[in-house]
Design a protein with these regions (language model features):
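N-terminal non-cleavable signal-anchor helices
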Residues: 96, 100, 112, 148-149
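Short, basic (Lys/Arg/His-rich) helix/loop patches that form interaction surfaces
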Residues: 12, 18, 26-50, 58-102, ...
Length: 155
């Protein structure tokens, strides 16, 4: 599956196609079962006066604050820290730093960013598949999961 993030929804103004690994698709489908058959994976619970059918930007931080209140020994973190966690996991998995940055839709700076227009879709797909395997193993509590770095392709 592919999730298309249009330019008007991305922080850097660049559209991106994000390859979704099978576990991510399964997690999204599981979330959708709670949506009462709406078009949204995360619908609004109440329409109220704002008249938008999906959750507000503040919903996840509010939910996270409730979870954090139950975990006083865990250092403070924000929703944005999940991106840092993803980037850290990709590094631990041996994903090329350039590919990992593109997984986060970060712009490449300097001359490299000007001349290199490759979207790295296949490389991002492989990286995100490996990350999904790690997350699935962690979700299942498998202590036997072994992180095996991706081998770099010869150019």
């Amino acid at each position: 599956a592919i999730w298309h993030l249009p330019e008007e929804r991305s922080k850097n103004g660049d559209a991106i196609d994000i390859p979704l690994p099978p576990p991510a698709v399964a997690w999204l489908r599981e979330l959708h079962t709670f949506s009462c058959n709406t078009a949204w994976v995360l619908p609004a619970r109440k329409m109220q006066s704002r008249m938008i059918p999906h959750i507000q930007e503040s919903t996840l931080p509010v939910a996270l604050a409730k979870v954090r209140a139950e975990m006083p020994d865990v250092p403070n973190f924000t929703i944005h820290d999940f991106r840092r966690t993803a980037r850290t996991h990709l590094a631990a998995l041996g994903v090329d730093p350039f590919v990992a940055e593109r997984c986060l839709n970060h712009k490449v700076k300097g001359v490299e960013g000007i001349y290199n227009r490759h979207d790295y879709f296949d490389e991002r797909k492989a990286a995100l598949n490996e990350w999904a395997k790690l997350l699935k193993a962690l979700e299942e509590g498998r202590p036997d999961y072994n992180v095996v770095p991706l081998k770099k392709k010869a150019l």
